[in-house]
Amino acid sequence: MLSLIIPAKELDECLFETIYNYTLTFNHDYEIIIVYDFTDKKVYEKFNNNFNNNKKIILLLSPIKGRINALNYGYTQSKGDIIKCIDADDTLLSSYFDELEIMDNYSAHCHNASLIDGNNKVIGTYTFEKNILFKDYQYVLSNLKSPPRWVWSFNREIAECIFPIPPELFAEDVWFSLIIKKNCNKIFHLNSEVYLYKQHDGGEWGGVKNFSAEVMSLRARWNLKLIPVLLKNKISLGIVSDDIFSNIISYYKVLLNKKSISNIILSKTTIYYKAKLFLIMYSPSLATLLISIKWLVSKQLIAIKKS
């Protein structure tokens, strides 16, 4: 059985429509666990009246507010052999289930997504990063490779390594990525778009293709806050030396400063990160174009390597 855990700040009409559609299109063994911080009484009654007799839909008021606390609590209430944690404003397509049985042969499973705007119009695609699949754990760790957590599905053995997520983390994506890469011998990649990933220009991370100075500075600040928490969990993450993050820390620190060629050149990071800094800081629109091309190429390269 699949346990689909959805953290939500509140129960709303959009989430209701999404869950209702799931009940119409999901024909496999599943449970949907929605963990919310608060809700309007009328909306709650709508959820309750429609799903109260459906044992597959579980509504839980989180005992502690916050996304990570909701995920942790949701997992404790789950019963599935496979766990997946998605976002309340996104959509998992029923085609995802076509490959679910292959999870019997893999500890973890990942996939691509279609990017949609606020009107649910497809505006692009997101391809899972091939380096996470084909490079070693130290590469993923040192570069803090962290695709969105919704890309992942994993068995309970891996889930026991992931949960509880350290509640002091600002964002949990990197925790999922590192724990899964470290503990999985094999990861299956479904090289197709089985998820609709909604983009919000004013969202927490600014949209996956947004490389504006303001957004990149915020991301850098938030990511720097993650590192001390990761270092507190050295054993779980297999961190041998604090220096493993030195290049990525230097990269983030440059992003926090005003645009300066000298800051980039003199930064104590790799040539790769210096080139990335020049691109993002001096031509963010080109960075947006190149990431789109990268995802298209990655999809083809992954297909070739798997064939």
Where are these regions (language model features)?
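Cell-envelope/extracellular polymer assembly enzymes that use nucleotide-activated donors
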Residues: 1-3, 31, 175
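Acidic donor-binding segment of Leloir-type glycosyltransferases
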Residues: 20-60
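C-terminal subregions of glycosyltransferases and related glycan-biosynthesis enzymes
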Residues: 24, 169, 182, 198-307
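Glycine-rich, basic loop-to-helix element that forms the pyrophosphate-binding segment
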Residues: 62-78
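Conserved nucleotide-sugar donor-binding catalytic segment
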Residues: 135-210
